[in-house]
């Protein structure tokens, strides 16, 4: 396309063309077909006579730029010359005629002083085609939707953008992911709810302690899927912030503490390493095989707090049997209590598949307790504190003891789904006297 110089009309012409290009209207040139484009001239008679003598015709991306003077219509030269068009300050873009029986007319875009009025639809115009194809005209909303980015749920993948957004929720103190509610300092710095009570000032800017709630960030957190706290240990799951803490309490990838009671062992490790740790470090613990065994506690009359521990292996699982004697202080008097409980070296889900029974039997008397084993995550301390186990005082212990030794019959059974009891459901202690 060549530009012709002359008069102010050419400048307006160039201004309109550049305005259309800046408005991102797409015009594709078809070099094989299309109508001839009228020559653009100025409104002066001298410029019109000079340009009417030229026989060269131009194409402008299959677009006809039309306009009229006062009556807004084209006038053709009666001498057979190329029709002339006067370009005013306003013009209208129209689609070209397609060399086929049917023609397509797209909605127009009104251009005023080099700007596009967005109140009308715009057309994505393609070159002419030999087939009778009708091209649909998308609206502005449809065109905006076609180029809008698809925003994934944050945390569902491992791409860089998700990691960058998740980094906003990292606590600067413990480096864990913060969960709602979010509190920020006047400078906008955040800290998690676990670390905030321990701080005297903002750890980032040393300003006042974060105390302003950030409601906007909480709305964003509702769209984020946070990885499990133990993802570095192998957990592949991501959770909404409401479900994250509940999962982490029972996550099988969380580190396991040493289950041996009464010891100051601070060991932590994977579930598969617990038994190796007990055999190497706590060598005094004895392991018996079978579903029915006798747990013999010796020297139960020793003063002070004492505990007895042994292992029972059955159903390809390992169970820890614990008997503890503790001082129970009462305002009236101080008494000693015995607590017996069974713990599975496994998760809570696995523990729900078993039931254990403890029984004391001697001198024509019988005392029994039946319940679901505690998991290694739950431990035995809480069960003993709540007396959720076989509990009896020293007077009852003497009824079943012989020469200071107390034998407890332990039976472990596997149950199916129908027989499975509620986690908090246990049998009461049965005491029988023959």
From Swiss-Prot:
Residues 74-88 have a biased composition (Polar residues). Zn(2+) 1 binds at residues 228, 235, 247, 251. Residues 27-88 are annotated as: Disordered. A zinc finger (RING-type) spans 171-206. Pfam families: Sina_RING, Sina_TRAF, Sina_ZnF. Zn(2+) 2 binds at residues 258, 265, 277, 282. E3 ubiquitin-protein ligase that mediates ubiquitination and subsequent proteasomal degradation of target proteins. E3 ubiquitin ligases accept ubiquitin from an E2 ubiquitin-conjugating enzyme in the form of a thioester and then directly transfers the ubiquitin to targeted substrates. It probably triggers the ubiquitin-mediated degradation of different substrates. This is E3 ubiquitin-protein ligase siah-1.
